[in-house]
């Protein structure tokens, strides 16, 4: 039997390079090897967008379109909407009964986002309990493997702790999922922070060449390099991070030329802009084709709802029996 692999996306806007190289690439590469679950986390989106939820549905459909255009194949992957599986909410409730507040309050991702998103009121139960809902997302299908970026590891550890505590209290049932780190676990945004829609620093997959070029030109490269022929320090350069993704085979030569002052930051930015744009040519073509038949996406989500719904119903029946409220 194939192991289950699961990942989710917040439908709060268009997909960007951080998504693609964070975990989508892993899902595409491993589609035939695992039983795949790929879902859109519209409840999670409400944790930060509860004051302005009107765009979530539109963004969700755009997100599914992007995923299919990138190569996520419904024949190998269950594509579904979080809110279409009500059993996730019920499982979250059960987990919340025994999850200590200290587990949530110590989560570094929680503290980081509260500090970074100061314009939003995140002093809510929904935002604090984000990792509990995430645990329910994962454990409702008893997933074995979770593709994640480094910043999501603390959340996954909370999922393991919740599974552990449930198994201890009510008997062995849940699998403790393990992470699959992507090769580019942290893609830098235009300001040097992790690429994120929330930080307004993302290069989107649907961006045109001029937009990509403009965003790449905004990036900080080497603050110690004053003149183009000065020796460079690629280890601190955000543009060099993209070379690691897109030109893995020639990375040593690029690093050498940079350190010797034989290639300037402007040259690198120009090359990376073109590489990024050209790498998305097939995606743009497929996305345009899918957009001509929107029912195609609705049908995919409906099928995913049916398939995952059956799994979720069984999990909840088993959990109720374990707890003793069946």
What are these regions (language model features)?
Residues 51, 147-150, 230, 260:
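Conserved aromatic-histidine-acidic binding/catalytic patches
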Residues 1-2, 310:
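N-terminal amphipathic alpha-helix/helix-capping segment at the start of soluble metabolic enzymes
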Residues 90-93, 102, 106-169, 173-191, ...:
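Classical nucleotidyltransferase
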Residues 19, 154, 160-326:
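Conserved nucleotide- and phosphate/pyrophosphate-binding catalytic cores
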């Amino acid at each position: 039997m194939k192991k289950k692999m699961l990942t989710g996306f917040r439908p709060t806007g268009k997909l960007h390079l951080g998504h693609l190289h964070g975990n989508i690439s892993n899902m595409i590469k491993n589609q035939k090897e695992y039983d795949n679950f790929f879902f859109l986390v519209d409840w999670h989106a409400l944790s930060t967008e509860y004051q302005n939820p009107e765009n979530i549905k539109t963004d969700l459909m755009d997100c599914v379109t992007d995923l299919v255009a990138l190569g996520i194949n419904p024949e190998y992957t269950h594509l579904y909407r979080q809110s279409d599986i009500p059993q996730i909410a019920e499982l979250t409730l059960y987990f919340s009964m025994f999850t200590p507040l200290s587990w949530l309050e110590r989560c570094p991702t929680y503290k980081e986002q509260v500090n970074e998103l100061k314009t939003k009121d995140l002093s809510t139960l929904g935002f604090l309990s984000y990792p509990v809902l995430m645990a329910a997302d994962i454990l409702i299908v008893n997933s074995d493997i979770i593709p994640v970026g480094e910043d999501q590891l603390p959340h996954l550890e909370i999922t393991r702790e919740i599974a552990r505590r449930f198994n201890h209290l009510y008997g062995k049932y849940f699998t403790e999922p393990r992470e699959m780190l992507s090769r580019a676990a942290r893609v830098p945004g235009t300001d040097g922070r992790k690429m994120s829609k929330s930080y307004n620093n993302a290069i989107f997959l649907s961006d045109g060449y001029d937009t990509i070029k403009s965003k790449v030109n905004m990036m900080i490269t080497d603050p110690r390099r004053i003149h183009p022929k000065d020796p460079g320090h690629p280890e601190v350069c955000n543009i060099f991070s993209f070379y690691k993704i897109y030109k893995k085979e020639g990375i040593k030569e690029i690093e050498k030329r940079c350190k010797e002052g034989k290639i300037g930051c402007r040259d690198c930015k120009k090359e990376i802009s073109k590489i990024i744009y050209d790498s998305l040519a097939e995606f743009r073509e497929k996305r345009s084709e899918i957009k001509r038949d929107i029912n195609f996406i609705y049908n995919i989500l409906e099928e995913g709802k049916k398939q995952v719904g059956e799994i979720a119903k069984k999990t909840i029946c088993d959990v109720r029996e374990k707890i003793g409220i069946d």
